[in-house]
C-alpha cells in the first residue's frame, strides 16, 4: 500500500464517513490490485485502459460474482479520481470501462404468518424475553439495519410520537415511526432496564451483563428465536429489513416513503422490493378477476 492509496482510504474515513466494513473492502480491493500490478510488472501511474480491461478479465477468471467485480472496479475508478485531484498528470484508466451488470435477485422475506409465529415464540417476560421482543419489534417494525439497532440510545427514542432516531450510512440521520405494539414492548422493557444497568452508558439494548449488545449478539438472539419457532428457518437482521419493506409495499405504501424509511440514497435500491410485491398483486388479481381464476 503506497502513500496515495493510504491518503485515499483516510479521505473515505474522515470525509465520507465510510464504515469499517466498507473501508476494509476498499483496502482489500487495492491490495488485490497492487498484487496484479506486481505480477504483470505494471506501474500504478502508467496503468492504461487496455490494462484495465485485462484486469477486468483477470477478476472474472477468479470466478467472482458480477456484483463483486463491479464493486472492485468502482473502488479503482474512485481511487484514480481521487488521485487526479492530487496530481493533474494522472489519467483515470477505469473511466471508460463499462461496469459489469449486476445480478438481479429478489430479497428473501418472511410471510406475515411467519412473523406472527416468531413473535409468539418470544416470551415477553423477564429482562431477556422483553429485550428479545424489543429487538424483533424494532427490526421488523422500522426496517432499520442491525448496525443502527445496536447504536440506539435512550435519547434517540420518542415514545410520544412514537418513533426512533437513527444514524445511518454516511452519517445521515433519520427518524422512523413505529406502532403501539413496539412502543408497549419498549416501555415494559425499560421498566426493568435501570436495575440491571451496571455499566455507565445510555444504550437501549444490553446483554446479561448490562453492557451494550453487539451485532453478533443480535444475530445470536434471532437464531435462538428461530430454533424455537416451528416452520421458520434462516433468519438474519437484513431479512427482517426486507420483510419490513415488502409488507409496507404490499399494504399500499408508496416507494418514496419506503425509501425514506429505509434510508436508501437511490430509489432503484428500494425498487427491487416492488418485484416481490408484484407477487402479492398477482395473487389478488388471480383471486379477483373472472378471466384469471382459471390460471390457478
Swiss-Prot record:
GO terms for cellular component: cytoplasm. Pfam families: Phage_int_SAM_1, Phage_integrase. GO terms for molecular function: DNA binding; tyrosine-based site-specific recombinase activity. PROSITE patterns: CB, TYR_RECOMBINASE. Gene3D superfamilies: 1.10.150.130, Intergrase catalytic core. Keywords: Cell cycle, Cell division, Chromosome partition, Cytoplasm, DNA integration, DNA recombination, DNA-binding. The lineage of its organism: Bacteria, Bacillati, Bacillota, Bacilli, Bacillales. GO terms for biological process: cell division; chromosome segregation; DNA transposition. This is Tyrosine recombinase XerC. Its main location: cytoplasm. The active site is at residues 145, 169, 238, 241, 264, 273. Site-specific tyrosine recombinase, which acts by catalyzing the cutting and rejoining of the recombining DNA molecules. The XerC-XerD complex is essential to convert dimers of the bacterial chromosome into monomers to permit their segregation at cell division. It also contributes to the segregational stability of plasmids. Belongs to the 'phage' integrase family. XerC subfamily. Residues 1-84 form the Core-binding (CB) domain. The keyword Cytoplasm applies. SUPFAM superfamilies: DNA breaking-rejoining enzymes. Forms a cyclic heterotetrameric complex composed of two molecules of XerC and two molecules of XerD. Coiled coil: none annotated. Residues 105-286 form the Tyr recombinase domain.
Amino acid at each position: 500500500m503506497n502513500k496515495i492509496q493510504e491518503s485515499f482510504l483516510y479521505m473515505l474515513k474522515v470525509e465520507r464517513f465510510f464504515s469499517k466494513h466498507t473501508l476494509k473492502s476498499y483496502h482489500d480491493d487495492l491490495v488485490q490490485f497492487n498484487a496484479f500490478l506486481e505480477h504483470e510488472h505494471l506501474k500504478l501511474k502508467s496503468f492504461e485502459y487496455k490494462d484495465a480491461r485485462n484486469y477486468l478479465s483477470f477478476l472474472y477468471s477468479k470466478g467472482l460474482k458480477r456484483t463483486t467485480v463491479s464493486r472492485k472496479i468502482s473502488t479503482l475508478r474512485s481511487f484514480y479520481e481521487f488521485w487526479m485531484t492530487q496530481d493533474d498528470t494522472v489519467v483515470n484508466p477505469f473511466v471508460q470501462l463499462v461496469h459489469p451488470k449486476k445480478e438481479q435477485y429478489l430479497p428473501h422475506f418472511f410471510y406475515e404468518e411467519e412473523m406472527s409465529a416468531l413473535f409468539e415464540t418470544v416470551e415477553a417476560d423477564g429482562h431477556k424475553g422483553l429485550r428479545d421482543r424489543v429487538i424483533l419489534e424494532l427490526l421488523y417494525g422500522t426496517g432499520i439495519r442491525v448496525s443502527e439497532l445496536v447504536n440506539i440510545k435512550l435519547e434517540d427514542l420518542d415514545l410520544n410520537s412514537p418513533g426512533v432516531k437513527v444514524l445511518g450510512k454516511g452519517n445521515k440521520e433519520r427518524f422512523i415511526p413505529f406502532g403501539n405494539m413496539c412502543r408497549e414492548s419498549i416501555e415494559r422493557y425499560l421498566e426493568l432496564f435501570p436495575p440491571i444497568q451496571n455499566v455507565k452508558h445510555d444504550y437501549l439494548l444490553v446483554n446479561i451483563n448490562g453492557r451494550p449488545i453487539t451485532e453478533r449478539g443480535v444475530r445470536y438472539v434471532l437464531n435462538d428465536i428461530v430454533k424455537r419457532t416451528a416452520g421458520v428457518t434462516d433468519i438474519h437482521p437484513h431479512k427482517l429489513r426486507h420483510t419490513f419493506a415488502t409488507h409496507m409495499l404490499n399494504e399500499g405504501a408508496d416507494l418514496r416513503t419506503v425509501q425514506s424509511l429505509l434510508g436508501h440514497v437511490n430509489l432503484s435500491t428500494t425498487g427491487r422490493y416492488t418485484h416481490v410485491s408484484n407477487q402479492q398483486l398477482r395473487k389478488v388479481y388471480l383471486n379477483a378477476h373472472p378471466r384469471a381464476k382459471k390460471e390457478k
